[in-house]
Amino acid sequence: MMQTKNKLFGASFEQSKRIVKDDILTEEGTQIGSFSSMSFWNRASLLLVLLANIITYGVGIHLPDSLRDAPESIQVVSESTGAQIGEVGFFLRPIIFGAIILFTVLVVLNIFPKINYAHQLLYGTILMISFIFLVAVATLPLTVGLTIGAFGIVAFVVQLIFSGYLVKILIIDVMKEVKASLYNEKEIKSKDWGILLINFVKKYGGILIGLSILNRWTFNFGEFSKSNPGLMSFLFGWLYIGFISLLLLAEGQLLKCLIKAFYFFKYRKEYREYFNIKDEQWYGKFRARFMSK
């Protein structure tokens, strides 16, 4: 009964006040900057963010296509690595292209005025999360291809397992902390899959990575390429796990912001009265002046 009641998005207004503070009324407090702004010109300036689509398209679609058609054109790493980047990009191309279109639509729609600050805050937070998702999927062909080229399939699988560990501590545990704050409860440690995964990675993660890298330089069991990678390829092989760590860290913090924005939106009438929010901030300067006439 208690488990059904205490849902992450099911807290009451009084309970939500434990995580929603008055700094949510400032761009710094929202942690999403101008994406929460009620000013038209601030939102219009965010159209410059669409320039990032040129980079994400180049890295996620154009580069893999070029390497798949002519893997010999790559100079920094081996031809086999270039071919692997191209193959991964081929399978992810529809997802990357869809993410670019979705992000573009969301940025353009962000220009239009929202009903009030609560709507803009929730929309802006979702927009930021979509940007992180776009960056994540657009860089996968490059980072996955470089990792497989450097360490091989076996080592990449080990890095995937470690990614699951990062999801556990940077996303799931963060959500549990927010839920515990909402209901003022102590987190109960249970032996779920996350605990088992954490214990496994702590005990055997380093050993597995070491053995899988050693396999890449010696026996090459289960590998497509039998050639040994160079020094630059070895260094690039850590790009996937490093980049995914940063993205998951950012995503975890943005999901916290999303939960706060959700409750601020859900109880917007109560929070407007609770924080004594003026018309100018709630509706924006232009609409507030129009309403005052």
Regions found by a protein language model. Name each.
Residues 172-194, 265-278:
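Juxtamembrane inter-helical linkers in multi-pass membrane proteins
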Residues 200-293:
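C-terminal transmembrane-bundle signature of multipass membrane proteins
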Residues 65-87:
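Perimembrane loop-to-helix junctions flanking transmembrane segments
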Residues 54-59, 130-156, 206-232:
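Alpha-helical transmembrane segments and their membrane-interface junctions
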